[in-house]
Amino acid sequence: MGSKVSVEESVRVVIVGGGFAGIAAASQLKSFGIPFLLVDMKDAFHHNVAALRACVESGFARKTFISYKDSFHDSFKQGKVVGINLQTQLVILESNEELSFSHLIIATGSNGPFPGKFNEVISKDQAIQIYENLVEEIQKAKHVVVVGGGSAGVEMAAEVKTDYPEKEVTLIHSKIALADVQLQPSVRRTVKEILLRKGVRLILAQKVTNLDQVTPNVAQENMELQLDKDSEVVNCDLVLCCIGLKVSSSSYRSALGDKMAEDGSLIVNDYLQVQGHENVYAVGDCAYINEPKMAYYAGIHARVAATNVRNSLIGKSLKSYIPGALSMLLSMGRNDGVGQFNGYYLGRCFVTMAKSRDIFVSKSWKEMGQTMPR
């Protein structure tokens, strides 16, 4: 990944957050031989891109949680970051422990509802069991409703209908077009066609008004979802929520509140440095960049930031990150998909081969230097 460099003893990069951006930054710094400490409140990386497959396939969840300690050893610290002191260059944990840094990479990611995101601070084995429990709930249900028709929502609906074609599956979305707004119209049309071909019922341009009164992820008979138009009611026995993604900003809000955009992400320059702080970088979902918040881009950000840490230490020019044409692959179940790469449409065969079969989990196990369980 990169040649090792000689650095002073005072150099230590602290990476806050162990999502896709965090593990990519850690792996890159490790290859450079630059001392780092990856900090996350959980004990394992969660491959949330593959979380939707873990909802329908028993045994798949154990492939989506990868131990930090087994990859990064003493360069990993489990703990919740509650503050950052930029003057003294300290990261403060909930336990009151202070971690010194010469450089800081903020990779806190985003939060959202289960099952697309998993935010509980429990052990890897307990987390895996929660997904296994959801598989059982989906198996029990006769009518599954997915709320939210963005990228996660359309993938979730496709996963359920692909593995359980006999079940009634309904997708409710507040807009007319499905998936990410920045995708080409042809890709978004294909998403709709795939769902309809699979037999998913689509309710578009409508919102659920009583979602806070419904228990998601648990199968129970005669649940009623109220829609905001025509007083329509949808009866179902399982609700899966794929809405409400928010940037995780609590760890840096007090220190960098004046550098935050409206959505809570951090304003960065072309080198991914936080505005006004040459030794502080923001990558992934918490970086304010005009592109969708995706694991693919998070990894690229992280490698650019890690490279810039190295370059700053050895006197080389910093590397710029300039967003290009959108690249996104949508897995529509294990046997279908659609997407685009650098603006070019990608059809079923390519996306199925590239993503839909294992949702890139093997790539993350390889990046973290571990063997994926079978």
From Swiss-Prot:
Top EC category: oxidoreductase
Cystine connections: none
Residues under site feature: 4-hydroxy-2-nonenal adduction: H173
Cofactor binding, per record: Binds 6-hydroxy-FAD non-covalently.
Listed InterPro entries: FAD/NAD-bd_sf (IPR036188), FAD/NAD-binding_dom (IPR023753)
Localization annotation: Lipid droplet; Cell membrane; Cytoplasm; Mitochondrion membrane
Lipidation (N-myristoyl glycine): G2
CC cofactor: 6-hydroxy-FAD
An example molecular function term from Gene Ontology annotations: oxidoreductase activity, acting on NAD(P)H, quinone or similar compound as acceptor
Regulation: The modification by 4-hydroxy-2-nonenal (HNE) adduction in mitochondria results in loss of the oxidoreductase activity and activation of a novel function in mitochondrial oxidative stress signaling.
GO terms, biological process: apoptotic mitochondrial changes; positive regulation of apoptotic process; vitamin K metabolic process
One Pfam family linked to the record: Pyr_redox_2
Function: A NAD(P)H-dependent oxidoreductase that acts as a key inhibitor of ferroptosis. At the plasma membrane, catalyzes reduction of coenzyme Q/ubiquinone-10 to ubiquinol-10, a lipophilic radical-trapping antioxidant that prevents lipid oxidative damage and consequently ferroptosis. Acts in parallel to GPX4 to suppress phospholipid peroxidation and ferroptosis. This anti-ferroptotic function is independent of cellular glutathione levels.
Family per record: Belongs to the FAD-dependent oxidoreductase family.
Name of this protein: Ferroptosis suppressor protein 1
Lineage: Eukaryota, Metazoa, Chordata, Craniata, Vertebrata
Gene: aifm2
